[in-house]
Regions:
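Short, well-structured alpha-helical segments in soluble
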Residues: 118-130, 239-249
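Acidic, Gly/Pro-rich loop/turn segments at junctions of secondary structure
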Residues: 133-146, 161-168
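Short beta->alpha connector loops
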Residues: 113-116, 137-142, 261
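Short beta-strand segments enriched in small/hydrophobic residues
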Residues: 27, 67-81, 186, 194-201
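Short, surface-exposed alpha-helical segments at coil->helix boundaries
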Residues: 43, 90-93, 146, 207-215
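N-terminal helix-turn-helix DNA-binding module of bacterial transcription factors
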Residues: 1-70, 345
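Bacterial carbohydrate/catabolite-sensing allosteric modules
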Residues: 2-7, 20, 52, 98-102, ...
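Amphipathic helical "hinge" segments at domain boundaries
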Residues: 55-121
């Protein structure tokens, strides 16, 4: 019995999933192919069994899915107001579309509130056969999405630092902490010792990494961070954090922000408080979005090549969909771009 539930490579089979869910193999096919009539409860039981067994229909995707949709999903877990104020995702989408559109692929964008809603959406998209794959953003510790998508038979790529142990291909610049390290060194060379950091949500892996590199770089130089504040990336949170920092008895002489959008808010808050940037407080962003080049003063920031990463992610996902695409490797790292928002302490 056990042998019939595993293939020659020792991997679980569709029969094993069917047996675990108490259904026929045809029902398993219907659950992943959105054909036939099965109840939502049965579909859920099949998907749970597939996930528990670690079974993916990707090896038999051609048999289970009669046609490609030529549509890929981008699901973003952000409030609409935060997404609307942050050009990061516009840059990412530009990079994705630059590779998808010429090949006749479209991008399906969804906004969700939490991980449960995001997981349910992937399950629905897979069951309805609406997309051929998904681009995952905002990697988290113990991220449930990669194994879920593998179980659903949906190709996926995860944006972030390359991780050979990741359950799905990861696409991003290497040495993610390099830009933060450069930024701290730059500020210290300018004489700054009271340096604060405005971080993003703590559950995001890239947020944790950047914050850790910021703190470690300072401590290695014998300097304590002036403050580290956590936000949700929103404009309101960035303004509140900046006002808190500027109200300190010994206010920071420099503030680093987790993205350019918050840095722009920070510059505005400082100027409204009557402070000059960079004469009274230096500001550093992260992303190198176009808006930073049009500010006064122009924003010093870390360039993580968002469009280029988006393009590489699209190529990696297209390759999984059977398309002939160029190499997806990114042989670069985030780099500091020095402009006029930083100056001597």
């Amino acid at each position: 019995m056990e042998a019939s539930r595993k293939d020659s490579g020792g991997r679980p089979t569709i029969k094993a999933v069917a047996a675990a869910a108490g259904v026929s193999t045809a029902a398993v096919s219907q659950a992943f192919n959105a054909k036939g009539r099965i109840s939502e409860a049965t579909r859920r039981r099949i998907l749970d069994a597939a996930t528990e067994l670690g079974w993916s229909p990707s090896a038999t995707a051609t048999a289970l899915r009669s046609a490609r949709t030529r549509t890929l999903a981008l699901v973003v877990r952000r409030p609409t107001d935060v997404l609307g104020a942050d050009p990061h995702f516009s840059e990412l989408i530009t990079g994705l579309e630059g590779e998808l559109a010429p090949r006749g692929y479209g991008l399906l964008l969804h906004l969700v509130a939490d991980v449960a809603e995001e997981s349910a959406l992937y399950e629905r998209l897979a069951a309805e056969g609406r997309v051929d794959g998904a681009v995952l953003t905002d990697a988290r510790a113990d991220d449930p999405r990669p194994p879920l998508l593998r179980g659903l038979g949906l190709p996926a790529v995860l944006l972030g630092a390359p991780r050979p142990d990741a359950p799905v291909p990861t696409v991003g610049l290497g040495n993610q902490g390099a830009g933060i390290h450069e930024a701290v060194d730059h500020l210290m060379e300018l004489g700054h010792r009271r340096i604060a950091y405005v971080s993003g949500p703590g559950e995001l892996l890239h947020t944790r990494l950047r914050r850790a590199v910021f703190e470690e770089t300072l401590l290695l130089k014998g300097v304590e961070p002036a403050a580290v504040l956590t936000t949700d990336f929103s404009e309101a949170a960035a303004l509140a954090a900046t006002e808190e920092l500027l109200g300190m008895a010994e206010r920071p002489t420099a503030v680093m922000y987790a993205n350019d959008s918050m840095a722009v808010c920070g510059i505005g808050a400082a100027q409204r408080a009557g402070l000059r940037v960079p004469q009274d407080v230096s500001v550093v962003g992260y992303d190198n979005l176009p808006i930073g080049r049009w500010l006064h003063p122009r924003l010093t920031t870390v360039d993580q090549q968002v469009q280029r990463v988006g393009a590489a992610a699209a190529r990696a996902l297209l390759a999984q969909c059977g398309e002939d695409v160029p190499d997806t490797a990114l042989d670069d790292r985030p780099r500091l771009v020095v402009r006029e928002s930083t100056g001597p302490a």
